[in-house]
């Protein structure tokens, strides 16, 4: 290794030092660059005694010997070729390949899903918690739901009765808060459910009154749906075909919470808190905050969220400024004025920023907002499914804004979602 000196390198160009900078002291750069040309052997990077940001190595014709050529051997110097590369300050040419290999080893791909439900793709005999991952199950589930036919006023049967159980208000004939004028034939119920699920039904399906319902050992995409018919109020004078929400329409709903993903029970408090806030406040006032201590895992979560529709994502690394304790006088003055809400404005004084440094804390943070309540809840569901894989890396928090915030392109979606009303009988 040859040390830096005028005998070994040739300074081709050097920019002047810039002493003044608006950056903090620990982030201030000298903005000085030199271009050097080695004359013999290797060159140490960075050169000794030079405060530079980048060093450019320029090949020369006299790099094999330090002795000047004789007069008879002098030839016109060919123009210098452009530098092949620019090495950052502190880079060693000898360790450059090792550095690249180290950087490549850091490019770790995190698999955000693991086998969870269903059957193993290679071994169908394996079933249980270590068989199918949630992403495959949710994809197949949503694909199956999209295939179902949504009944409208024209295609719905003439007499349909849907019982939603004891969860809906009682005292209404027909069950589930449906109008009393709806037919109560069990054959029509089975036919409607089969038409929604797309399963052929026998001509005369007879269900015994004392039949017992057994829990299937695995998820069946054709057995855990039930149709919910939204009837137009009887007081509406308009015809059902042109009534509110397009008249009588049948939608597919899950049968119960047994088919929820496994992470739903683990992060139950998060879903309940988001649902509570969205019942009390508008979706434009609720935001989801995620913190992560690993940059690669944070980028994996960010990439997954950016594949969702109708969401806004703000992500970055947390910065902390210079830490300075408060004087007892400042603490006493602040607490004295803030004891009385009517005297809060009396303690406001001009603030002079005096922090001389800042640095990164190593924590990555992300704020997610949705165009509608459903979009925000979908973002929470996706985050919970990914965070569940690495609970020691992520942290989920729900924040309530004092002023609503929504992206301008999301306004039409928001207005359409909020204008939809479920008709009551």
Swiss-Prot record:
Record keywords, A-Z: Host nucleus
Keyword Signal: no
Domain of life of the organism encoding this protein: Viruses
Biological role stated in the UniProt entry: Plays a role in the inhibition of host DNA replication in the infected cell. Targets the mini-chromosome maintenance (MCM) complex and blocks the accumulation of MCM proteins and their loading onto host chromatin.
The protein, known as: Protein UL117
Family: Belongs to the herpesviridae U84 family.
GO cellular component: host cell nucleus
GO BP field: regulation of DNA-templated transcription
Pfam families, sorted: Herpes_IE2_3
Stretches for region Disordered: 59-83
């Amino acid at each position: 290794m040859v040390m830096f000196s005028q005998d070994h390198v040739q300074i081709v160009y050097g920019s002047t030092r810039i002493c003044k900078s608006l950056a903090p002291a620990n982030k201030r750069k000298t903005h000085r660059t030199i271009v050097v040309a080695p004359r013999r052997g290797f060159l140490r990077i960075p050169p000794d005694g030079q405060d530079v940001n980048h060093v450019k190595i320029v090949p020369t014709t006299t790099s094999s010997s330090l002795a000047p050529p004789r007069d008879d051997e002098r030839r016109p110097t060919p123009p210098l070729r452009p530098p092949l590369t620019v090495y950052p300050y502190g880079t060693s040419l000898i360790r450059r390949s090792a550095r690249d290999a180290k950087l490549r080893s850091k490019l770790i791909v995190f698999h955000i899903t693991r086998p969870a439900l269903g059957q193993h793709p290679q071994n169908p005999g394996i079933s249980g918690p270590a068989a199918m991952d949630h992403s495959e199950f949710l994809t197949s589930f949503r694909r199956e739901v999209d295939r179902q036919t949504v009944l409208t006023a024209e295609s719905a049967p003439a007499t349909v009765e849907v019982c939603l159980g004891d969860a809906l208000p009682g005292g209404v004939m027909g069950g589930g808060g449906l109008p009393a004028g709806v037919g109560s034939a069990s054959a029509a119920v089975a036919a409607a459910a089969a038409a929604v699920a797309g399963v052929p039904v026998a001509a005369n399906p007879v269900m015994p009154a004392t039949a017992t319902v057994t829990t299937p050992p695995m998820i069946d995409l054709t057995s855990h749906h039930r149709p919910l018919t939204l009837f137009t109020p009887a007081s509406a004078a308009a015809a059902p075909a042109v009534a509110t929400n397009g008249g009588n329409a049948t939608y597919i709903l899950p049968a119960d919470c047994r088919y929820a993903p496994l992470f739903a029970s683990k992060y139950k408090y998060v879903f309940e808190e988001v649902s509570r806030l969205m019942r009390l406040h508008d979706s434009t006032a609720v935001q989801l905050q995620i913190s992560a201590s690993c940059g690669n895992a944070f980028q994996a979560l960010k990439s997954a969220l950016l594949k969702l529709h109708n969401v806004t994502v703000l992500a970055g690394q947390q910065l902390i400024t210079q830490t300075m304790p408060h004087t007892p006088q400042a603490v006493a003055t602040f607490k004295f004025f803030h004891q009385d809400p009517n005297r809060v404005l009396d303690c406001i004084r001009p603030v002079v920023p005096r922090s001389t440094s800042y640095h990164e804390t190593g924590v990555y943070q992300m704020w997610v907002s949705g165009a509608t309540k459903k979009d925000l809840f979908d973002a929470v569901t996706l985050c919970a499914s990914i965070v569940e894989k690495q609970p020691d890396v992520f942290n989920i928090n729900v924040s309530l804004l004092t002023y609503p915030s929504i992206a301008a392109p999301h306004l039409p979606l928001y207005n359409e979602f909020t204008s939809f009303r479920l008709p009551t009988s």
